[in-house]
Amino acid sequence: MRNSLAILTLLSGFLLAQPSFTASDIVSNLAGASAVSAADMDGDGDIDIIAADEGGDAIHWLENDGNANPTFTIRAAYGNSDGPWAVVPYDIDLDGDLDIISASHVDNKIRVNVNNGAADPDFDDTVYDVVSGVDARGLDLGDIDNDGDIDVVVAGGGSNYVKWYENNGSQSFSAVNIDVGANNPRSVFLIDVDSDGDIDVLSANASDNEIAWYESNGASDPTFVQRTINNSVTGAMSVYAADMDNDGDIDILAAAQEEDKIYWFESDGAADPSFSATTITSSADGIYSVYAKDLDNDGDMDIMSASANDDKIAWYE
C-alpha cells in the first residue's frame, strides 16, 4: 500500500510538472511572420507583443487589451528594417521604457527603435545602427562580462558564427568570437542555463538541426564551452529559455521550421543539466520564432510563435 501511494505521489508530481497548451491565433496577416517577442511596451501592466514580418520589411507592436482572455490590436508598423529576422524589447537608453532592438539580415544591421515614453507610445522610426556589417539573423542583449553595461550577442547566419559584441562603455562595441564553426545559426538567447551565476548563450543552428549551449566560465573576459542540448530539431530556427513548469530551473523552447514544430526541452535541474523533449505543436507552418511570457496574467507561461508560411503570430495558452 505504501509503495502504491508513493507511485501515485510521483505520478501526480510528474503530471503537475507537465503543462498542456491550447493554440489560438493572435494575427494571421503578416507577410512572412519572422519574429515574435513580448513585453509591457506601453507601461500599462499587461504584456504586449512585438512582431516582425520579413516579407513586408516591417516591425509591429500589438497592444494587449488587458482582459483575462486578451485580444491584441496592431498599433503601428515600422518599415526601415530590410529583412527583419529578430526583435528584442530592451530599455537601451535607460530612460525607463522599453525600446525595440532588431536584426535585419538583408542590410546586415542591428537597429533600435526608441520608445518615446507616451501612454500610447511611438517608436522613433529614425533608427540608428548599433552594429553594422554583420550577417544578423538573431540577437540578444545582456551583461555578458558582468561589467555593468549591456553587450550584444549575434547569430551570424550564413557566415556560420556566434559572436558577442562587448560594450566598451562609450557607445562602441568590439566583436569577440564565441563559435566560428556554428552551422547556419539563426537565433541566440542569453540566460544562466545551469544556475551558476553567469550568463550562458543558447543558439539554434539550422543546417545541423542543433540547439547548442555555450557555457560561460564566468570570468570578466569570459570563454565558452559548447554543449549540445539536442541535434534533432530539423531546421532549427529559434531558441528561447524560461522556467516553463515552475520547478525552479531553466527549460528551453525551440522552433523546428522543417517540421512545423515547437519543442520544449525540460531541464532535470542538475548542476550539469540534461533535457527531455516534448512537442508542443506540429502545426506551426514554417515556424521562424518562438517566445514565452504570461500573456493572460494567470500565473503560468504561455508560448508564442511566428510562422512564415501562414503569416501567423500564434499563442499557445
Where are these regions (language model features)?
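Blade-edge motifs of beta-propeller repeat domains
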Residues: 18-31, 63-82, 114-134, 166-183, ...
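Short coil/loop residues immediately preceding or within conserved phosphate-binding loops
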Residues: 33, 56, 84, 136, ...
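Beta-propeller blade termini
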Residues: 34-41, 85-94, 137-144, 186-195, ...
